[in-house]
Design a protein with these regions (language model features):
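A conserved pocket-lining segment of Rossmann-fold NAD(P)-dependent short-chain dehydrogenase/reductase
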Residues: 168-184
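N-terminal Rossmann NAD(P)H-binding glycine-rich loop of SDR-like oxidoreductase domains
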Residues: 3-23
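Substrate-positioning beta->alpha
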Residues: 132, 180-194, 205
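Core catalytic loop region at the nicotinamide-binding pocket of NAD(P)H-dependent oxidoreductases
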Residues: 199-211
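Catalytic loop of short-chain dehydrogenase/reductase
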Residues: 101-133, 141, 152
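Conserved beta-loop-beta element that borders a ligand/cofactor-binding pocket
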Residues: 138-159
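NAD(P)H-binding glycine-rich loop region in Rossmannoid oxidoreductase-like domains
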Residues: 4, 35-93, 201
Length: 211
């Protein structure tokens, strides 16, 4: 497949990039600063572009089969839902009709009507980013764009680790293991993202990945 990836220089985006290239996909990485992307590969094309400025990358989109966005803006989290809106519009205009968005875990439910972010112990430092991702999810759900989006929430804890290739796929509820922990490695999260892109089996849905 031909895939355009936004956010390839981020910690998680770079793992997703490696997974896509290792599967033999042709990847166009749209990054603000190409010098920050150390990956080199025959299947990789790097394009300088800013999600906030569609004209900087719109010309590279036609002909791609799918797109993946792994974005964050800790300096101004309010940019995140705006990025979702722009990408939905720009990708659909370019004829890219499959789109995976790396979301957050804060909107997952721990009980009916109770979200992860509603827990009194939810860290204050993460709240702005979590709220921004909740707003992004609302953008996707309200969108009328002709694009098969999938909003993919990680487990509550996601960190570098082993690529096991085995994990669970859920929906609106936070997935926890027998000990009550919600975890996944970045490597296995990337596996799940590429699985969804290849299969296209979660169109217009939010899903979550965890052990």
């Amino acid at each position: 497949m031909k895939i355009v990836l936004f956010g390839a220089t981020g910690n998680l985006g770079n793992v997703i990039l490696d997974e896509a290239l290792n599967r033999g996909h042709q990847v166009t990485a749209v990054v603000r600063d190409p010098s920050k992307l150390a990956t080199t590969h025959a299947g990789l094309t790097v394009v300088r572009g800013d999600v906030a400025q569609p004209s900087s990358y719109a010309g590279t989109l036609p002909g791609n089969d799918a797109a993946i966005a792994s974005l964050n803006d800790h300096a101004d989290p309010a940019n995140v839902p705006r990025q979702a809106t722009l990408l939905l519009e720009t990708l659909s205009q370019a004829g890219v009709h499959r789109f995976a968005w790396v979301g957050g875990a804060g909107s997952l439910e721990t009980a009916p009507g109770v979200r992860v972010i509603d827990d009194p112990g939810f860290p204050d430092a993460w709240k702005a980013s979590a709220k921004a991702q909740i707003e992004a999810l609302a953008v996707f759900r309200a969108s009328k764009a002709p694009i098969d989006w999938t909003y993919i929430s990680p487990a509550a804890e996601i960190a570098p680790g082993e690529r096991k290739g085995s994990f669970r796929v859920g929906g609106e509820q936070l997935l926890v293991n027998a000990e009550g922990h919600s975890r996944i490695s970045t490597a296995d999260f990337a596996v799940g993202v590429l699985d969804r892109i290849e299969k296209g089996d979660a169109a217009k849905k939010r899903i979550t990945l965890a052990y």
